[in-house]
């Protein structure tokens, strides 16, 4: 989880990475302890629940858990990705058979597996609850961890065969896992495959740009506080540095608030080329005062300049990722007015493209 707090030396807003995973609320622990295991081609292929004695399809096993304080359970599953490895997701949906529009949610960098999905479902799902109440199926997604500069250095994924087996020019990246998830949810019987949306925050917001630049299977997307430095081919300034222990870039303290500064440090021709292939309507959400607000805005500006279907909204809030409302220290959801407005705006955006 990433939050903003004042830097004690400079007084500026800087990002603090909270590395400890929030504990499940007591109520959530109780329901997880009694989670129903659903054997599960049935759960994914159709709406019929079979008994444990039924034939098990190992590629379609789903575990259903209650969500604390909610009437909508989560169906935990694994999706096969390009190279045959599996990535975890958590699906929730309204009552009934659908077909429903569906929105996939992504937050920040990848990794941490099913534990992350379960924790986010129990502790960061107020926003998703509002979507389900508005008639959407929702998915918390996980994907591979970011690979430093792989998107910039190795180009698009190319698939071939060698000795009858799959051959790739590079390993799949996190946004390609997301495309696999998108294609998977389109096969679910309660999902309308023509009404699939995506909402990504921070690195997940950049993934919205990467996905739609190469893939035209989304009806609409939201890029919330998109950390687009790689997509825009931005060269960091001296506010970023190299981590001496890993040799990798540390950009957590990078300051890119001004659009003029950002434009002067990106590869404009390359960024415009990547933007040119986007066909998906995109809402870009900024956050006033964020140290990367210039990056957020330039992503939108380039969409607008290229004549794309794009919208911009910016909000006054202290927390990076404010649109994904988390439980407070007391274990309850208590969204403020700005968070509620951001979520309402997000639902309204998807409604325009994904509701009849």
Predicted segments, located by residue:
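N-terminal cap/lid segment of alpha/beta-hydrolase-fold proteins
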Residues: 55-97
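Alpha/beta-hydrolase active-site loop
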Residues: 156-189
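C-terminal catalytic histidine-bearing segment of alpha/beta-hydrolase fold enzymes
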Residues: 309-356
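Mobile cap/lid helix-loop segments that gate and shape the active-site cleft of serine hydrolases
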Residues: 71, 218-274
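Short beta-strand/loop motif that positions the catalytic acidic residue
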Residues: 278, 284-286
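Short glycine-enriched nucleophile-adjacent loop
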Residues: 205-216
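Short substrate-entry loop that stabilizes the transition state in hydrolases
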Residues: 98-100, 108-148, 292-293
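Alpha/beta-hydrolase fold nucleophile elbow
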Residues: 191-202
């Amino acid at each position: 989880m990433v939050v903003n707090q004042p830097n004690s030396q400079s007084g500026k807003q800087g990002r603090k990475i909270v590395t400890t995973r929030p504990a499940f609320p007591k109520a959530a622990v109780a329901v997880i302890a009694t989670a129903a295991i659903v054997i599960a081609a049935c759960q994914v292929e159709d709406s019929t629940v079979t008994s444990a004695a039924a034939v098990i399809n190992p590629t379609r096993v789903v575990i259903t858990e209650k969500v604390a304080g909610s009437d909508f359970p989560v169906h935990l599953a694994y999706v096969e990705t390009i190279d045959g490895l599996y990535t975890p997701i958590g699906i929730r949906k309204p009552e009934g058979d659908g077909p429903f529009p569906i929105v996939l949610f992504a937050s920040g960098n990848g990794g941490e597996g099913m534990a992350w999905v379960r924790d986010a479902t129990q502790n960061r799902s107020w926003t998703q609850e509002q979507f389900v109440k508005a008639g959407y199926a929702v998915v918390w997604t996980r994907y591979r961890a970011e690979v430093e500069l792989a998107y910039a250095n190795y180009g698009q994924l190319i698939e071939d065969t060698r000795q009858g087996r799959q051959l790739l020019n590079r390993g799949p990246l996190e946004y390609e896992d997301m495309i696999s998830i998108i294609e998977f949810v389109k096969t679910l019987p309660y999902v309308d495959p023509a009404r699939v949306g995506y909402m990504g925050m921070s690195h997940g917001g950049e993934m919205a740009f990467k996905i739609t630049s190469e893939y035209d299977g989304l009806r609409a997307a939201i890029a919330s506080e998109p950390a687009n430095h790689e997509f825009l081919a931005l060269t960091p300034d001296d506010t970023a540095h190299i981590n001496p222990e890993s040799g990798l870039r540390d950009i957590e303290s990078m300051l890119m608030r001004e659009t003029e500064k950002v434009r002067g440090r990106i590869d404009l021709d390359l960024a415009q080329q990547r933007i040119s292939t986007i066909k998906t309507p995109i809402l870009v959400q900024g956050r006033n005062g964020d140290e990367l607000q210039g990056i957020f805005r330039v992503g939108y500006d380039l969409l607008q300049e290229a004549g794309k279907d794009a919208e911009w909204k910016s909000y006054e809030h202290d927390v990076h990722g404010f649109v994904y409302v988390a439980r407070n220290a007391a274990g309850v959801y208590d969204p403020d007015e700005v968070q509620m407005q951001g979520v309402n705006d997000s639902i309204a955006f998807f409604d325009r493209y994904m509701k009849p």
